[in-house]
């Protein structure tokens, strides 16, 4: 199978074997969570609850401030026990709401989704995405509704999902694609509806064969919604496309190298377009989103669920029992590390994200946020 890519790049050891085959497990329901108001690029949310308030899972606890901002929501049900400034894994103190669990884990009652999301107006979909607090989950944390609102003079033709996951150690995206490919593809379809485009792409590095197979099967069903008439083949993967198909999704196996997941490199590898220096993806007609973001969009639009949890890879040579965990936003790093057997004696540094672009943590009493794809414990050899 030929693989798409770009000129240059580096080839760090991927070091994913410890978790690449481990199914996602649910982390324990935390006894308390710390929900930062600044989990995204742009203006932090403003707390709208006070100490003593009772909240439900999915209830809004922070309101967006301005156009480049999103709300934040309770990830557990319980009582607000503090509102103030707390350490963030981004390296600074940030306003946050602390919730103590009541053990019931009850959803807020006013959450509702729609089965008919492909017939919804793009503006209505953007509003749902914003109200759900969805941001880029690959680490950039840019508000998704803003990224899906390009200027009218920018003609968007392609929606691209980033499933490269080129950072060493991390496997949260690959496990999502392998275990929940329908969520990813349905999310992509919603993105395509918002952007009013007919061509979608999913770029996945070729060392993730399980993810490629699972997502390719779901991508084929996009065409299967209409009557099949023709076949075509790309990179060794067969697709059925009906004559006059209104929407198609193509899975593109990518070369394994870094930074394959960078937007400009990904667009070159999937769509074949070069984004010139000083220009943005929208200037060549493309919008890129992470696969986890796409899945979050689907769950928000279909089921009314705001972004209150995500998959986190807890791994590295400094972790005794690496795992892929489905984690509530606001769960403290030290709790997750404890659920993975704790740190080894050789652990020297803990990083949020991967070793290439991650943020070293001076302390572990910091919460998982929307952009936390991994918690990696490194030894002195890696640092």
Model-predicted regions and their roles:
Residues 45-54, 58:
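Short histidine-centered loop motifs in beta-beta connectors
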Residues 1-48:
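N-terminal, Lys/Arg-enriched amphipathic/low-complexity engagement segments
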Residues 106-108, 136, 159-173, 318:
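Gly-rich Lys/Arg/Thr-decorated short loops/hinges at beta-loop-alpha junctions or inter-strand turns
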Residues 78-80:
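Conserved hydrophobic positions within beta-strands
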Residues 82, 87-137, 142, 153, ...:
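Acidic low-complexity segments
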Residues 34-43, 64-69, 376-383:
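Ferredoxin-like iron-sulfur electron-transfer modules
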Residues 178-195:
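Histidine-anchored nucleotide/phosphate-binding helix
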Residues 198-333, 339-346, 354:
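Hydrophobic alpha-helical positions that pack around
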């Amino acid at each position: 199978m030929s693989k798409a890519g770009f000129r240059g790049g580096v080839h760090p050891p991927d070091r994913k074997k410890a978790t690449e085959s481990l199914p996602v497990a649910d982390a324990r329901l935390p006894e308390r969570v710390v929900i930062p108001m600044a989990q995204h690029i742009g203006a932090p949310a403003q707390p709208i609850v006070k100490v003593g308030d009772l909240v439900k899972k999915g209830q809004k606890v922070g309101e967006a401030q301005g156009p480049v901002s999103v709300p934040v929501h309770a990830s557990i049900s319980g009582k607000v026990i503090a509102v103030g400034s707390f350490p963030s894994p981004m390296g600074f103190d940030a306003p946050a709401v602390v919730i103590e669990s009541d053990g019931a884990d009850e959803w807020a009652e006013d959450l509702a989704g729609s089965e008919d999301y492909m017939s919804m107006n793009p503006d209505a979909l953007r509003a749902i995405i914003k109200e759900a607090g969805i941001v880029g989950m690959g680490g950039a944390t840019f508000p998704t509704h803003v990224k899906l609102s390009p200027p009218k003079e920018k003609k968007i033709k392609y929606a691209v999902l980033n499933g490269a996951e080129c950072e060493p150690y991390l496997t949260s995206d690959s496990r999502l694609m392998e275990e929940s490919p329908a969520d990813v593809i349905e999310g992509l379809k919603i993105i395509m509806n918002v952007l009013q485009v007919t061509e979608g792409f999913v770029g996945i590095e070729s060392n993730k064969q399980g993810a490629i197979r699972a997502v390719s099967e779901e991508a084929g069903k996009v065409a299967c919604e209409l009557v099949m008439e023709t076949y075509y083949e790309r990179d060794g993967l067969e697709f059925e496309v009906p004559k006059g198909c209104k929407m198609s999704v193509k899975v593109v196996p990518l070369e394994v190298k870094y930074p394959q997941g960078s937007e400009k490199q990904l667009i070159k590898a999937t769509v074949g377009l070069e984004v010139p220096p000083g220009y943005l993806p929208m200037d060549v007609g493309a919008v890129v989103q992470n696969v986890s973001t796409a899945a979050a969009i689907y769950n928000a639009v279909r089921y009314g669920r705001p972004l209150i949890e995500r998959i986190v890879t807890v791994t590295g040579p400094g972790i005794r029992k690496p795992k892929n965990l489905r984690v509530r936003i606001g769960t403290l790093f030290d709790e997750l590390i404890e659920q993975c057997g704790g740190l080894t004696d050789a652990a020297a540094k803990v990083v949020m994200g991967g070793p290439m672009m991650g943020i070293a943590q001076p302390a572990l009493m910091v919460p998982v946020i929307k952009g936390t794809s991994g918690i990696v414990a490194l030894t002195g050899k890696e640092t």
